[in-house]
């Protein structure tokens, strides 16, 4: 995909919806390598890791003695785990796409904060992450940050793919619409109407 075609199509979707999908960006050999490393780290429980029981989200085990308490949620610190992940994060094509989306020619930096991880979805005990804006995790003066999500496997409705509310990145909801954990309160009518606009983002490996 050329820089110009990305600028014409995906960048417009990004500005309008707050996200965009670049299909078939990563070849099979490369995402296969990343998936193999991630699977190996999962099987060996290589720290740092986060378990579902640690977060207590809906659907997660209640405590460490409950069934499913050993269900993994995330492999943390992906950037430091293996050179393959670092090379992916610093890939020139990733940089070109981000520069286009952010409409900048300045140097870009990789943040190793919250989203520096490998997400997993295990059958039975994977929890539901409630509705939120990613900025809830970031304590920065400027909001010119973009999360890059690479699918290492098929992601669809059957296995808990990502869901988004298009255009919600332009909203600035009153603090009263969030709970103490900065999730949208589903009991409020104004939030219900917003959540009803949600769509699923199904991905293929390499998207």
Task: Please provide the spans of the model-predicted regions.
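Non-heme Fe(II)-dependent double-stranded beta-helix
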Residues: 1-17, 23-131, 137, 177
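Short loop/turn motifs at secondary-structure junctions and domain boundaries
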Residues: 3-4, 142, 192-193
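Short, charged/polar surface micro-motifs in flexible loops or helix N-caps
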Residues: 94, 123-125, 154-157, 170
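Short, structured patches in soluble enzyme cores that scaffold and shape functional sites
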Residues: 117, 133, 150-154, 166
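Glycine-rich, charged/polar anion/phosphate-binding loops
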Residues: 133-136, 149-150, 195-197
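Short, conserved beta-strand element in jelly-roll/cupin
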Residues: 139-157, 202-205
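Double-stranded beta-helix
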Residues: 155-207
């Amino acid at each position: 995909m050329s820089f110009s075609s990305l600028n014409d199509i995906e960048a417009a979707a990004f500005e309008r919806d707050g996200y965009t999908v670049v299909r078939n960006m990563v070849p099979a050999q490369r995402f296969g390598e990343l998936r193999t490393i991630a699977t190996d780290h999962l099987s060996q429980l290589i720290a740092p890791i986060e378990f579902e029981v640690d977060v207590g989200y809906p659907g997660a085990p209640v405590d460490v003695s409950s069934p499913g308490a050993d269900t993994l949620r995330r492999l943390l610190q992906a950037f430091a785990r293996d050179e393959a992940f670092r090379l992916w994060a610093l890939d020139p094509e990733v940089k070109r796409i981000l520069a286009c989306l952010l409409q900048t020619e300045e140097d870009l930096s990789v943040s190793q904060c919250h989203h520096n991880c490998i997400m997993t979805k295990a059958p039975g005990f994977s929890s539901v992450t409630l509705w939120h804006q990613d900025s809830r995790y970031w304590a920065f003066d400027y909001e010119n940050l973009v999360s890059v999500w690479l699918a290492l496997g098929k992601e669809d409705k059957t296995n808990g793919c990502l869901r988004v509310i298009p255009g919600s990145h332009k909203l600035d909801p009153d603090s009263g619409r969030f709970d103490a954990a900065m999730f949208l309160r589903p009991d409020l009518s104004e939030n219900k109407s917003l959540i009803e606009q949600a769509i699923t983002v199904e991905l293929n490996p390499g998207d």
